[in-house]
């Protein structure tokens, strides 16, 4: 990593996104208010500008024999591999890509994959980088809560967001 050469996003971009999400979320409970408050207070330093998929979730990764195929690339509010990492973390935490198949409930295979992914993050990123990724994951949760209409899926999201937030520094409990 050549951190000195990396360009980072200005804090204002994150402040605007958080404000937009806050404005659009209806029925803010105590947990959502705490998450939004934490996002507003966060420094948002050192989020690198980079090439990014934009919507890297398990739904957008196809496996064909030994090949991985990435589909549904999209523009997001930032282009950063941190955002891609956060979206995968979001997906593993709440099994969002599998919400129609098992009501968002995890299973042994998904839990094992999630644990391997969390270990990958812990082994390859420092504490500040992981905190940035986790904070972006909180934004991912709020973004999806904004457009989710199904009450069961909304409960799934809110419960998993609370679990992540309440156990922010203990990845074993995500």
What are these model-derived regions, one by one?
Residues 8-12, 128-138:
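Acidic carboxylate-rich catalytic motifs and surrounding loops in phosphoryl-/glycosyl-chemistry enzymes
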Residues 30, 132-136, 140-174:
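Regulatory N- and C-terminal appendages and interdomain linkers associated
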């Amino acid at each position: 990593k050549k951190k000195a050469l990396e360009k980072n996003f200005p804090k204002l971009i994150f402040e605007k996104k958080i404000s937009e999400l806050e404005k659009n979320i209806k029925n803010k409970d105590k947990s959502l208010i705490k998450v939004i408050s934490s996002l507003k207070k966060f420094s948002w330093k050192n989020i690198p500008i980079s090439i990014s998929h934009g919507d890297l979730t398990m739904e957008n990764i196809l496996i064909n024999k030994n090949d991985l195929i990435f589909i549904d690339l999209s523009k997001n509010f930032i282009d950063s591999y941190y955002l891609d990492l956060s979206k995968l973390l979001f997906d593993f935490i709440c099994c969002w890509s599998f919400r129609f198949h098992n009501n968002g409930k995890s299973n042994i295979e998904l839990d094992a994959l999630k644990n391997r992914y969390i270990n990958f993050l812990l082994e390859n990123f420092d504490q500040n980088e992981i905190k940035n990724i986790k904070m972006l994951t909180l934004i991912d949760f709020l973004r999806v809560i904004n457009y989710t209409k199904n009450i069961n899926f909304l409960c799934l999201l809110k419960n998993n967001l609370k679990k992540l937030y309440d156990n922010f520094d203990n990845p074993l409990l995500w």
